[in-house]
Structure formats: C-alpha cells, structure tokens
From Swiss-Prot:
GO terms for molecular function: arginyl-tRNA--protein transferase activity; leucyl-tRNA--protein transferase activity. It catalyses: N-terminal L-glutamyl-[protein] + L-leucyl-tRNA(Leu) = N-terminal L-leucyl-L-glutamyl-[protein] + tRNA(Leu) + H(+); N-terminal L-aspartyl-[protein] + L-leucyl-tRNA(Leu) = N-terminal L-leucyl-L-aspartyl-[protein] + tRNA(Leu) + H(+). The gene is bpt. GO terms for biological process: ubiquitin-dependent protein catabolic process via the N-end rule pathway. It is found in: Cytoplasm. The lineage of its organism: Bacteria, Pseudomonadati, Pseudomonadota, Betaproteobacteria, Burkholderiales. This is Aspartate/glutamate leucyltransferase. Its EC number is 2.3.2.29.
C-alpha cells in the first residue's frame, strides 16, 4: 500500500496563483477586468502549460493567465476537435483562395519585416489601443518570449522571379501542447481587403494538428458580446470550457450568465483554488 506522502504530486503543485488588480477590459467597453496569474513563470514548461490551457489559461510572453473578473464570465475558452471538424462552404473557399501561400515554420525570432507588418496591422486594426505604439522591446516581450514549445509561422506569396522572397502576408505564433496546437497571436497585411487571413490561419493550424496527430486546436477566448471574437464561432464543432468541463458548444444556444451575473470561478486543475 502506498503511503500518502509517497503519492505523486500534481505537476501544478509547485505553482501559485494570484489575482491582479482591476484594469480596463480590452474586449468589452466600459468593463473592468481582472486576471488570475500562474507563477513562477520559470516553472511553467510545456507539460505544465498544457494542463493550464486545459483549465482555461493563456499566455502573453511568459505571463500565464486566465480571466478572473468580478461579476463576469463572458470569456469562454474554446477549442476545435480537429478529428470532427467539418469546414463550411465559405471556409473551403478561403482555403482554396490562399492555398498558394507558402508557410514557413521556424523557432521564435525577431525579423524587422515581421515587426513592420505588426505595426501596420496594429495601426489599421487597433488604432488608439496602445499596441499601435509598441516598441521593438514590447513586441518581443509580447510575442517572442516563451519558455515552452513555440513556433513562428510566416505566410508569403510564391517567390518572385529571380528568387526574391514573395510578399509577406501574415505571421502567426503558435504553441505546441501535449494535446494540440494553441493559437497565440496572428497579424497580417491590413491593406489586403476581404481576405479572411485569420480564418485561413486557423484552417492551416487544424491541418497541422491533424498531421501531428494532435486532437485539438485551442483558439483562446470566445466572447459573445465582442464582434472581434465572432469568427471563432464559425468553426464546427466547437468545444467550450464551462463550469470546469469541456463540452460541445453551440454559440447560438449556449446559456451563459449575463455579463453582470455573479462570477462562478472554475476550479484549478490539481485541486488548487485561486487567491484574491
């Protein structure tokens, strides 16, 4: 018989969790947000991060967090089960439209052309939000710092005559987890109108997950009230983490508490509870 002190510890047992001070919500105007943060960051390797993502966490650089807002649970972690995914007619058109793009996967690294595209994207899509003024250091801290298995993917047109690289269209950062791929951030050429690069990028990740034998693509948070998040509801089937469990989510019918309802915080994996 195994003595209780000899039982294996949860891989998260060395972590601590705390709640941040309130700050303005970046998704819902006029709302106040808080995050629950997992620390210390140097202990969060790929295996531990996989468990955290399954519990609704995300990362920004080496900062690992999940929403922990008072009176709101509008952010629903979502993922696509790639084996069951069926593209819509529109998604099939987007796939065919951009299939000539050349994807190159590499370790995270700084590239001046990537940074220039990032700044054009932020200025066009998120002007006045603060990120349109990101310095190179801020860009690197946000997207190029990672202690887990992360990759940078650039999408270009076919090489030009003479061997010059094709025009850069999109850059995506992804994490490779034990059970899937996790979309970190994607930015693309803002002057290309009606391209649906973001949709194509998710379709590409779904195909990559299939080729790697990974069952899921994690898309971060879906927020019903946020138009910027609406595209995530177009992938079927879609699973959402509600009340601590992943289940197939019907965005049109799922019963979510009103934004002002009392917060119901999901338990941490391994039996931890959040502070604050």
């Amino acid at each position: 018989m195994t003595h209780p002190t000899e039982l294996p510890l949860s891989p998260l047992s060395a972590l601590q969790f705390y709640a941040t001070a309130p700050y303005p919500c970046s998704y819902l105007d006029g709302r106040i947000a808080r995050s629950q943060v997992a620390t210390p960051s140097h202990l969060i390797n790929s295996d531990i991060y996989t468990e955290l993502v399954k519990a609704g966490f995300r990362r920004s650089g080496v900062f690992t967090y999940r929403p922990y807002c008072d009176g709101c649970r509008a952010c629903v972690p979502v993922r696509v089960p790639v084996g069951a995914f069926t593209p819509s007619r529109t998604q099939r058109r987007m796939w065919k439209r951009h299939r000539a793009l050349v994807a190159t996967v590499s370790p995270l690294h700084y590239d001046e052309e990537h940074y220039a595209l990032y700044m054009r994207y932020q200025s066009a899509r998120h002007a006045g939000g603060g990120m349109d003024r990101d310095s190179r250091d801020q860009y690197e801290q946000f997207l190029l710092q990672s202690r887990i298995n992360s990759r940078l993917v650039e999408f270009r047109d076919l090489d030009a005559p003479g061997g010059e690289p094709g025009k850069l269209r999109m850059v995506s950062m992804i994490d490779i987890l034990g059970d899937g791929l996790s979309s970190v951030y994607t930015f693309f050429e803002p002057d290309d109108q009606h391209t649906s690069y973001g949709t194509y990028n998710i379709l590409w990740q779904i195909e990559q997950a299939k080729s790697l034998g990974l069952p899921y693509v994690y898309l971060g948070y879906w927020i019903r009230e946020s138009p910027k998040m609406a595209y995530k509801a177009n992938f079927h089937p879609l699973e959402g983490l509600l009340d601590g469990r992943w289940n197939v989510l019907d965005p049109d019918r799922v019963e979510l508490p009103p934004v002002d309802a009392a917060l119901a915080r999901a338990p941490l994996p391994g039996g931890h509870s959040g502070s604050g």
